[in-house]
A protein has these predicted regions:
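Aromatic-rich carbohydrate-binding modules that target alpha-glucans
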Residues: 1, 86-137, 149-183, 189
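Long, internal scaffold/assembly segments composed of regular secondary structure
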Residues: 1-59
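Sparse, context-dependent recognition of short Cys/His-centered cofactor- or disulfide-binding micro-motifs
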Residues: 7, 72-76, 118, 129
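A general structural signal for short secondary-structure junctions and capping/turn motifs
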Residues: 10-13, 79, 133-134
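Active-site-adjacent segment of 2-oxoglutarate/Fe(II) JmjC oxygenases
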Residues: 13-18, 169-207
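Basic K/R-rich, polyanion-interacting modules in nucleoproteins and related proteins
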Residues: 44-99, 185, 198-212
Length: 212
């Protein structure tokens, strides 16, 4: 007997784009993505304004697939000795900003969960969406996600269908060149089983996956 798996089209999903990043390992210095550093009550890091990438050609931009790495030059143990800093994000839309479109900053640092502290607000004077978010020192990947609805308590909002409303590619775009790390979980449910069973687990990188 032969078991044929032919579920390619329904199981397909968008490839996304490489993540954006910033690095605050040195609190007093502006790295490649940081435009300005200020010292108020604590350090404030202002990132260079971003623009949507969904209408631009793909550019290879090495990332850590949405992850983050705590690190500091001011101590040997970043998990304990790293400080906190306010990071300022700004996104310049292609057209006129829309106060009824909600944009969130997402990454593994917040488990990709939209909630009020990661919501951007539109600054009509500067014509940009802006957000001010508290981070521990380190290297972070992040991306922008669009939503037509406002998440007041993250995915715990019972009135919303969770991530169904999130468009994670509307700003950053989709490219088949994008390098991604995937984790595969295989479940099985027998005829007499009441629950599905996890029977296999694996991981693969899009750079070395083939159809064999």
């Amino acid at each position: 007997n032969t078991l044929v798996y032919d579920y390619d089209q329904p199981a397909s999903f968008w490839g996304g784009n490489e993540y954006l990043n910033f690095d605050t390992k040195d609190m007093r210095a502006a790295t490649a993505a940081i435009q300005e550093v200020r010292l108020e009550d604590i350090y404030e890091h202002y990132l260079y304004p971003n623009t949507p990438r969904n209408n631009k050609p793909y550019t290879y931009f090495p990332d850590v697939n949405g992850d983050f790495i705590p690190r500091t030059l001011q101590g040997a143990l970043p998990e304990r000795e790293g400080d906190y800093t306010w990071v300022h994000f700004s996104l310049k839309p292609n057209g006129k900003g829309n106060s009824e479109t909600y944009i969130y900053v997402l990454g593994k640092f917040n488990n990709y969960t939209p909630s009020p502290e990661y919501l951007m607000t539109y600054n009509a004077t500067q014509k940009m969406y802006q957000a001010r978010i508290l981070f521990k020192q380190g290297f972070y990947n992040y991306s922008y996600a669009l939503s037509p609805v406002l998440y007041e308590t993250g995915f715990s909002d019972t009135s919303l269908e969770n991530e169904t409303y999130l468009d994670e590619n509307g700003i950053d775009g989709n490219f088949h060149f994008t390098e991604n790390q995937y984790q595969i979980l295989v479940y099985f449910k027998g005829f007499l089983d009441q629950h599905q069973r996890l029977v296999g687990i694996g991981s693969a990188n899009s750079m070395n996956i083939n159809d064999q």
